[in-house]
Amino acid sequence: MIRRSLLLSAPVRITALLLVLVFAATGCHRGTKGKNADEGMPVEKLYEKGHKLMEGGNWSGAESSFKRLVAQYPYGPYTEQAMIESAYAQYKAGKNDDAVSSIDRFIRTYPTHRNIAYLYYLRGLANGNSDTVFLRRVWSLDSSRRDLSTPRQAYADFNIVTERYPNSRYAADARQRMIELRDVFAQHEMDNALYYARRGAWISAAGRATYLLETYPQSAFQNDAVALLGESYVHLGNKALADDARRVLALNEPGHPWLQGDWPKYPWIARKLNPFAGEKSAATGQRNARMNRK
């Protein structure tokens, strides 16, 4: 009996030994697999890897490499540049809120950095692009009909670039983008003014048109605002002010359709009943129609 028990215990010991070896091998494999390939990589190599990923348009991969660099090497010129390029990668990937957060963190940490003008410029790009990006792509919504809080922040960012860093390489483009944003804000006011006009609220329509002219002079919609002022004064029975508006408009845009009694025209009512038609600006539609006739 003793000999038989010893013989039977041998296979058991062999099986137990095999199980130990299997578990050990599995553990080693998992440890190797779980180890990040970038861990321990020299800072120069890690930065070069992230930069190459950016050049190839792999924004997510670049962001990951730059974040790994910052985690492993929290100080130094490579770290500062990696933080900047990580924010750019986030912006290019459409992660605008993340980009703005990264930029704000950098500005707080390095307020006098040599590339600080670029950071404000990039924040302007991200803020100007962050509002309902998906909806604009799918439904082609007019930019002036959106919430304008982030475009206004973008305008403030570009204004910082032009005022604090007028000689930077980003100042000229920032000025141009400010002009475009002012037109968006003016269009927003024009759409509101036309909304009131369509409903016969002529005092409110005149007030919006006046605000547009005072707040956004020389915008692309200034002549429309003058025309709407004239139309409002006609309906309010103020012939003198209506005639003044007509004279001003004739000097600045003699071909404006209001002078021929053919303005404003509103979108066809059936369009508003179609949920798939997209939201269009009455101001833009009328202005584009005039431009096409020229």
What are these regions (language model features)?
Residues 11-12, 23, 76:
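Low-complexity intrinsically disordered segments
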